[in-house]
Amino acid sequence: MVPINTTTGTPQHTRVAGALGAKDSSVRLQAALAVGSNPDPGLLETLVERCAVEPDFFVRDMLSWALARLSPEITLPRIRQELDSEHAQARGQALHTLSKIGDRRAWDWITRDLLRDTDDEVARTAWRVAVALVPEDEKKNLVDDLVAQLGRGGRDVRLSLSRALVDLGSVIEPALEKAAANLDPTVAAHARATELLLRYPEAGFDVAIDEAKRVVTLGPERAAAAATAAVAARVAGSPETAATMESTGSTGSTEAAEIADC
């Protein structure tokens, strides 16, 4: 555990720091709640330091909430420093805290290095924050950075990336169309699944990726038509049409599933 510096704080600050570092996670959670309920700028450093080492998800989330309750004028500069930390949790939690604060001044801090962070959890958080803060005239550049990572990671990572892209809206369509023709079948399937989610968000990621994998070996034109028709049929609740589309794509389904497995 990273030690917390309490030498310059008041006795109350020392007690709070002790509670935030207690062995019992419920004690730490209550302490973070108390700090957030009574914002104290003197505890800024303690909260930031705890974010970097706190093992419990719910406590970390409460710590970020407590930081968001402080004035952004003092909080943002300190959080910005954490984005360059060598510790992945510190970077990720700093990004999460920025999402809670929601101050668009932080957009410039969401660098390409963060969007492509080697730690999946950091990258996923960076995608979410970037989509929330991006100015309108920067959306295309953000789309390019996100689309470049299609096919990355397992199901949860790919779902996060698809959600981030879909949240940007129709601006993603040209880049996805290009990525859907990628020679890497994993990238192509992920791009097609994201296209389908944009058109039919109610279909869900698993349905979209299943259809994308099913038709990825049929060729660009037939694949796009088959995937769109199959998902549309499922959304419309037409089992006959869906069955027809499943039959159409059956010849390539096994190979597609192997090469585009999520």
Kindly give the residue locations of the regions a language model identified.
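Intrinsically disordered, low-complexity tandem-repeat regions
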Residues: 237-258
